[in-house]
Amino acid sequence: MVQMRSKNMAYESGTNNYSDTIANGNTLPPRSKKGHSGRRKRSETLPIACNNFCVTRQIDDDEQAFKMLDKVSHLKKFSAEDGDDNNIFVQWADDITDILFGLCCTGTFLKLLISSALSGRAKTWFDSTTEGIDDHVIKAYSFEKFLALLSEEFDGARSLRREIFTELLTLSIDSEKSLEAFAHKSGRLTPYYLSSGAALDLFLTKLEPQLQKQLENCAFPMTLNLALLITACEFAKRASNHKKYRYKNTRDSDICTPKSKNTAIVSKLSNTKTISKNKVIEKSDKKNYFDKNSQHIPDPKRRKQNEPGMRLFLVMDEEKNILTSRNVSANAYTSKNGHTNLSDLHTNLKNSKSQQCAVEPISILNSGSLVTGTINIDLINDEVLGTKEETTTYDERMDGNSRSLNERCCAVKKNSLQPITSNIFQKNAEIQGTKIGSVLDSGISNSFSSTEYMFPPTSSATVSNPVKKNEISKSSQVKDIAQFNPFMTNEKEKKLNPSESFKSPGVSMEINRLSRIAGLRNIPGNIYEDSKMLNLKTRKCYPLHNFAVRTRSAHFNDRPSNYISPHETINATLRSPASFDSIQCITRSKRVDAETNKATGSAKSENIETKSRKFPEVINPFLVNTTNKKESD
């Protein structure tokens, strides 16, 4: 029974160990021997099992390698940085040992697994260290050997502390900042890597001899912290003394050199004075003078270049060539053909090296019409010019290709503004009469024509007897002023012919002189056109009172009879300028009674008054007294 039973067990086991027993027919050993032999077999089969794992499963090495890499990648990596200490390294070593336990692999693959579990400085050092090992030698490196290599280098962040120690050796202590750096780095090394005494000796070697003697002679037992404190106090004392020395030097330099400072202030003041003087001169030059051979082009924004216009040129002679300017002004009017010749004037001005500048046009109308320009009288005033120089002004009309139509020139001499007699001007007017008539008949009659100014110099040959000239101007002064003043004309008065303004130069000049005194512009000749100045003819005149002061507490009925409320004036689009207050009326309009100083009522104003009194039931509480007076009347 025992034999049959042993045979069945051996057959069921199917092992090669019992095959010999079955074949030879031998019996099994006793029970005690069985247990002993079984233990021996297990001890003997462990390396065999390991060998079978490594050898028989070589086909599955790639799959196992990927699994190992995945496990290591999820592991917390060791970097050996400043915050990593010995405990962190031990924890990392235990974790990677658990992952790689039972793996029968060596060499390059194991090196790759360990490198994937490192980062930072630890990974850099491990890769650089194992890179130089031969492939045949690295096959003998097991996991324990790689781990010992890492522990030797990174146990307690040994390499990091070594780097800090090298920095301490090269550090020089010469300021408070370097002293703080030494204290910080030595504090990281003293407990584990560097002793307190060694750190103190290293610190003393870096100080100056004076500080070394001061620390050696100290009465207290010297430690690293005490040495750092004494050195910091010494550096702070030196810094304060240096600041005081610099401040003292600056004060001494300021006290010793007061003259240079004052001279600098004086030079600044002189520079500011010269700059202010130059600015004043520049402003006056902009008004009166211009550089030689320089032409001031008018602003294109203020006039259209494509439309015909008139330019006013101001030619100034800085070199005071009086004879040259007089000859030029005389030749401008005494041409061979009897016309004003601008080309000769241009050539003469260029030969005399005079100065030209274009003044912007004063007014520009629609295209195809005449353009007027009036000479600014401020250029002749003594306060504006400030110097006694002769100027030659001429105006030029640009009308397409032809420049000869309506060309007028005038020569002006300062302090010699005298009107020309009518007989001399009539000669010029007769020559230009045909051209002016043709222009007026051609449909340009509703445009403005500027009043001509002619101021010849005293030495000119065209000047006639001044006594006769003054008589003519005085005789025609009052009559022509009443005709030319638009604020004193009546509707029934006849319109003036525009050509008549060319036949009375003295009168036109006197009118413009009076308007200049009043602060007005020069009055054009054809200002009486219905389409332009309709409201100026119908405006009523009244004494120039200050109604705001006079009627502040008065009733409406106490105001002057010729006072017109702004609500009663219809179609009064033009407002009288403030300069009208200085005008003294020479003649009165027919609408104002000279004796009673009251304006005659018109149908239009009566209708307006009746319309304004239609609603008696509406009572204004502020006008109770006024309404009572009206009811009593």
Curated annotation (Swiss-Prot):
Keywords: Membrane, Transmembrane, Transmembrane helix
UniProt feature, compositional bias: Basic residues: 31-42
Annotated segments matching region Disordered: 12-43, 593-612
Compartments (UniProt record): Membrane
Signal peptide: none
Source organism, top-level taxon: Eukaryota
Disulfide pairings: none
Compositionally biased residues, Polar residues: 13-29
Keyword flag Glycoprotein: no
Membrane topology listed for this record: Multi-pass membrane protein
Entry keyword annotation includes Lyase: no
Main location class: membrane
Transmembrane annotation, as ranges: 99-118, 217-233
GO cellular component: cytoplasm; membrane; nucleus
Miscellaneous comment: Present with 105 molecules/cell in log phase SD medium.
Protein's name in the database: Uncharacterized protein YIL092W
